[in-house]
Structures are given as structure tokens and as C-alpha cells.
């Protein structure tokens, strides 16, 4: 039973081995070059591309970079190493061939992401690339990221091929952070692989790291959309980005030429690196990508008959037919060769180098996060763990801790790092800042209202105080008036009493 969004190795069509013929040739070239590095009668490569591949071949083992800085041996030293003191062949020259056979047996993991706005034929392109219905057109899922798995076999070598599709990209009303879904997926696969390597049993490791991203641009005479520019800038820092012009048959030759010039100029001005992980050595030997981007492509799952009567993949129009594999019409075949025939190993190796940098940075971040546990409560730790961090860890000289660092890695596990990644998420930070801004605006409005109310209350209180003072003043006046009246009343009573006493004395005197 097949799961949705994946394909089994038995589903591979007959055309699949042809697609990976370039990868098989790479294995042969590296096998021959490895023998040539140690063999006395080896012949130097004739082409710069073959020389570049020979120099890089010995560094690729099981999809990983190993011993890339080892110098090549000259014929004299090679002869001395291949034989012992008695001149007998000890068989060391066969080791590179055995290693290449082991590499061919184990195969290689390769993940390709197709990104861009909806309606640009990303699904049709993938199906055209492998001449099979790898992605069903009728699958309508609401997931922003869909992964399709397949195993490509050919010439004794197999390729574990993954396709990452991004349906519905750019269809939201607010596309400010639409790119975050793809960026988070790339970062999450890097983190997942780091934690898989820390497990005791690494035989079940799953490598879904994205090695290359084809970004589809809408054909237009007005340049590139802002959404595409922002998204490519974010992706180019995390994956080998290759811009392509979708549905190039909608433009005339002159319009297509001008649009390519506009795209290259915009990419240069916006500082968007193409295949950012490629080193100088690869850049000097690999010029196909950097001379011909953006690639103009036409995709089709239908077969037509060309002018020679041959059955080819193409599109039939009223005015004629277009063979999508004919370089005269588009760069479909060139792009296919660029990815699989010429630069597959470079894409994988450069991604491996980027992964090593991310791994070192992430391990250092986990150690610093463990140090912060002593001063903050961002991570819940036990007293035993706290005692270990305080007494046995030297956070000033991390390298001196040696194996003790793994104790910190156990404390700062994937759950903690996922939480940290969420806290560092640009959309989360932006939403948080927007929420704080709205809160501050609301708070300022409420504070302003409170100040107005306070001012109004103070004014009313002042009016009340004035009224109270006036009433107190009136009360005092009334009290004074009452006192005057009482005084006058007392004086009046006193005078009346004195008059009465005088009259009584007069009457008594008369009687006598």
C-alpha cells in the first residue's frame, strides 16, 4: 500500500535510469579518477570539468565530505606507496575503487524543492523531468509543504530522490510571511538531522535536507514581484537557489531576453546569491549555472511528433509544435543536465558543508542556553543538573569540557530547541512586536483618558473646595453676626435690669 505523497521504487518508469545517467557517469569518473590518483600509468584529464570532478571525487563518501584537503599524490609517491620495500604490489591502489563501489551501493540522498507562486507549472515540470506522473495533478491538499519520495536506479547506482512541493504559495490575502513555511522546513530538517546523529542507533537516519531549490518566476515584462524577491533572499541563505522562468513560451524571444536581463539585474541589486554554498573551486569549474540563469523552461507531460517524425515531449499549438527538450526553444534539457549530470555531487557536498556549519553553531547555542539556565528559568532543570552546570562545566572555555558537553546537550534537547526556534521565528517576533505596539497604543489611550479624568476631577475638587471656602466664610460671618446679636441682647438685658433696680430704690425712699 502506497502512502499519499510518496512513491515506491517499483513505481519508477523505464526512463528513470536515463535520467540518472549523469550520476552514474559521475560514479565512473570518480572511480577512474581515484584509480588515476594512485596509479603510475594514469593519464591526466583533458577537460577542466573532468579535472575538477577528479579532484573532488575522493572527498565524497556516502554523501558526506571526508578528507577534502588532502593533496594529490604524484606518480613517484604513488609508486612508493603502492609497493613495499621489495617492490611487491600490496593492493592499496584498489582501495579507492572499492570505496567508489561502496558509494555506488549505498547510493545518495538528494532533495529538490520547487518553490514559487501557484499556477506556474511546478508539478508539470517535475513530472516532465522524470517522464512519469511522480506528482498527481488531482491531489488537492491544504498542506503548505508536500514531500514526494522515490528511488531512482540506473547503472548499478540508486538515488533516493525527494521532491518538496509548495502548493498554494502566495495565495493568502497577507503574504508577508508566506516564505516562512519553506524556510522553517529547511531549518527543521537541518535540526532533525543533527539530533538524529546524536542517537545511539544511526542506521535508521532519514536525510531530508534540501540540497537545491528551483524558484519559479512568473513570465512578465514588469520585472519580479516583491514576494518573489523577499522569498528568494530568505531561501538563498539556506539552500542552493536556482531561479527559473516558468512558461517561457508566453514570451517572445526578445521579451524573454529582456526579462532574463531584468531578473539578473534585480538579483544582483538585491544581493541574492545563486548557489550560495558553492566554493571558489566549484565556481571556477562550474559555469553553467552562473552563465545561463535564470533558466527558461517549458513543461509538458504530453508527447508529440517533431519535424523529423520523432515522438518527443512537447506542446502542440495552432502555429506549430515545441519540443521542450530542444535547447532552441527552452533550457529544460540544460537545467536537467545541470542538476543531475554536472552538479549533483556539488549540490550535495556544498549542502553538507553548510550543515556542518549549522551543526557547530547549534551545538554552541545549546551550551550557551545551558549556561543561561543558571540565571534564568527558561528551562526547567533538576537540582542535580543545576549542580552539574555550576560545578563541573566551564562555559568560558567550552572545548575544555570535552565529553561533559554532551550532558548539556541532553538538557537542551530537541524540545527545548524547537521552542527556541519558535521564539526566534521572525513572524512570531513581528506578531509579538505588533501586539506590544497595539497594547502600548491602547495603554497610552487609556492613560490619556485617565489623565483627562484626573484633571477633570481635580478641577471639580477645586470648585468644591472654593464652594466650601465660600460656605465657611459665610458661616464665619453668620457666627460673627450671631455673636453680635447675642452681645447686643446681653447688653440690652443688662440695661433693662439696671433701670428696674433704680426704680425700686426710688420707691422705697419715698415710702420712708
From Swiss-Prot:
It is a peripheral membrane protein. Keywords: Coiled coil, GTP-binding, Membrane, Nucleotide-binding, Sporulation. GO terms for biological process: ascospore formation; cytoskeleton-dependent cytokinesis; protein localization. InterPro entries: G_SEPTIN_dom (IPR030379), P-loop_NTPase (IPR027417), Septin (IPR016491). Residues 246-249 are annotated as: G4 motif. Residues 376-406, 451-496 form a coiled coil. Residues 106-365 form the Septin-type G domain. Residues 31-68 are annotated as: Disordered. PANTHER family: SEPTIN. Belongs to the TRAFAC class TrmE-Era-EngA-EngB-Septin-like GTPase superfamily. Septin GTPase family. This is Sporulation-regulated protein 3. The gene is SPR3.
Amino acid at each position: 500500500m502506497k502512502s499519499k505523497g510518496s512513491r515506491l521504487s517499483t513505481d519508477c518508469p523505464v526512463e528513470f535510469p536515463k535520467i540518472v545517467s549523469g550520476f552514474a557517469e559521475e560514479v565512473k569518473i570518480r572511480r577512474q579518477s581515484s584509480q588515476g590518483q594512485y596509479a603510475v600509468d594514469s593519464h591526466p584529464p583533458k577537460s577542466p570539468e573532468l579535472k575538477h570532478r577528479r579532484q573532488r571525487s575522493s572527498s565524497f563518501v556516502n554523501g558526506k565530505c571526508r578528507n577534502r584537503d588532502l593533496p594529490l599524490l604524484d606518480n613517484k609517491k604513488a609508486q612508493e606507496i603502492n609497493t613495499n620495500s621489495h617492490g611487491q604490489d600490496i593492493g592499496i591502489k584498489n582501495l579507492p575503487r572499492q570505496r567508489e563501489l561502496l558509494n555506488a551501493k549505498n547510493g545518495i540522498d538528494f532533495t529538490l524543492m520547487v518553490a514559487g507562486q501557484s499556477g506556474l507549472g511546478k508539478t508539470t515540470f517535475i513530472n516532465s523531468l522524470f517522464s512519469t506522473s511522480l506528482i498527481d495533478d488531482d491531489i488537492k491538499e491544504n498542506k503548505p509543504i508536500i514531500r514526494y519520495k522515490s528511488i531512482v536506479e540506473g547503472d548499478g547506482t540508486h538515488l533516493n530522490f525527494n521532491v518538496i512541493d509548495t502548493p498554494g504559495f502566495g495565495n493568502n490575502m497577507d503574504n508577508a510571511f508566506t516564505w516562512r513555511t519553506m524556510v522553517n522546513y529547511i531549518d527543521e530538517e537541518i535540526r532533525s538531522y543533527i539530533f538524529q546523529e546524536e542517537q545511539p542507533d544511526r542506521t535508521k537516519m532519514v536525510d531530508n535536507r534540501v540540497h537545491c531549490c528551483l524558484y519559479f518566476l512568473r513570465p512578465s515584462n514588469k520585472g519580479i514581484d516583491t514576494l518573489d524577491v523577499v522569498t528568494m533572499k530568505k531561501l538563498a541563505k539556506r539552500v542552493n537557489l536556482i531561479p527559473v522562468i516558468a512558461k517561457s513560451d508566453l514570451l517572445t524571444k526578445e521579451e524573454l531576453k529582456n526579462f532574463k536581463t531584468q531578473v539578473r539585474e534585480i538579483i544582483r541589486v538585491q544581493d541574492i546569491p545563486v548557489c550560495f554554498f558553492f566554493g571558489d573551486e566549484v565556481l571556477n569549474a562550474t559555469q553553467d549555472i552562473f552563465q545561463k540563469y535564470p533558466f527558461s523552461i517549458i513543461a509538458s507531460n504530453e508527447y508529440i511528433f517533431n519535424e523529423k517524425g520523432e515522438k518527443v515531449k512537447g506542446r502542440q499549438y495552432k502555429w506549430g509544435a515545441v519540443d521542450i527538450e530542444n535547447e532552441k526553444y527552452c533550457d529544460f534539457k540544460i537545467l536537467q543536465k545541470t542538476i543531475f549530470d554536472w552538479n549533483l555531487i556539488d549540490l550535495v557536498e556544498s549542502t553538507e558543508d553548510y550543515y556542518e556549519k549549522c551543526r557547530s553553531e547549534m551545538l554552541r547555542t545549546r551550551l550557551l542556553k545551558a549556561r543561561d539556565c543558571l540565571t534564568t528559568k527558561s528551562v526547567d532543570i533538576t537540582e542535580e543538573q543545576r549542580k552539574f552546570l555550576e560545578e563541573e562545566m566551564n562555559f568560558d572555555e567550552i572545548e575544555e569540557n570535552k565529553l561533559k558537553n554532551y550532558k548539556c546537550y541532553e538538557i537542551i534537547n530537541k524540545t527545548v530547541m524547537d521552542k527556541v526556534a519558535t521564539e526566534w521565528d521572525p513572524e512570531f517576533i513581528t506578531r509579538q512586536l505588533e501586539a506590544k505596539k497595539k497594547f502600548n497604543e491602547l495603554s497610552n489611550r487609556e492613560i490619556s483618558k485617565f489623565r483627562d479624568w484626573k484633571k477633570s476631577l481635580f478641577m471639580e475638587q477645586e470648585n468644591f473646595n472654593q464652594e466650601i471656602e465660600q460656605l465657611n466664610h459665610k458661616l464665619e460671618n453668620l457666627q460673627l453676626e450671631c455673636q453680635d446679636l447675642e452681645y447686643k441682647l446681653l447688653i440690652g438685658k443688662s440695661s433693662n435690669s439696671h433701670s428696674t433696680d433704680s426704680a425700686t430704690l426710688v420707691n422705697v425712699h419715698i415710702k420712708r
